[in-house]
Amino acid sequence: DGFDGAQFNVGNDKVQFQAAYGYAVEGAVEGKNQKENNTFTYASIKGDLNKHVNLGGFYARNNKHKSDNTDFKNLYGFSTDVNFDKVWVGGEYVKGAGMNKGTAWTAGIGYGAYDQAKKGTWDVKAQYFNFGQYMGAVSSTWDIAYDFSQTDATGTNNNFKGFKGWLATANYALQDNVGLTAYYGFNNKTNKATGTNDKLSNYYRVDLN
């Protein structure tokens, strides 16, 4: 996402470290002026444990923000990607410190060897997403429809939080450097701390790159 501030990066082929301080200017804070937009402090590290396993972790602090049990001041998370030949298994976990129902996680499995530069290559993935009642996906790496920018089930709140569901993804290289990607999201529901969850519509999307 867009970021206005100072950033420091260091690393090698095995380990990468990043630290940053400043303002986010896209995603959940798009359109806010400087007075409305708090600064963030961010640090992350990721690296290869071996040729099959990649691990990562991050910490973010929403400066000058008073946290409560529905919003975060300190946020941290971990991720992993495991690859054996054509099989991929991966997941992410994020926690808003001090928040009630302030966790989010995803886990997935895939098969294939898609390379957009090589005609005929392909892969498929299936992933499950679970965002606690007070967590929303902001500019997610994955193309889920129910992210923070969407309206909630009542149609009155455009900061959508609390979601769980599945996403299937397929990639295929039609020609060298021409790829087709199809997404299908299904079995989607809200993720309330109490009460009955609402069913959400299935969705699909196709991209040509």
Feature-to-residue mapping (PLM):
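Short, solvent-exposed loop/turn segments at secondary-structure boundaries
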Residues: 1, 30-35, 68-70, 194-196
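Short, well-structured alpha-helical patches and their helix-loop capping segments
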Residues: 1, 7, 33, 37, ...
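Outer-membrane beta-barrel channel domains
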Residues: 1-23, 157, 204-206
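Structured alpha-helical segments in the cores of large, soluble enzyme domains
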Residues: 6-8, 45, 76-80
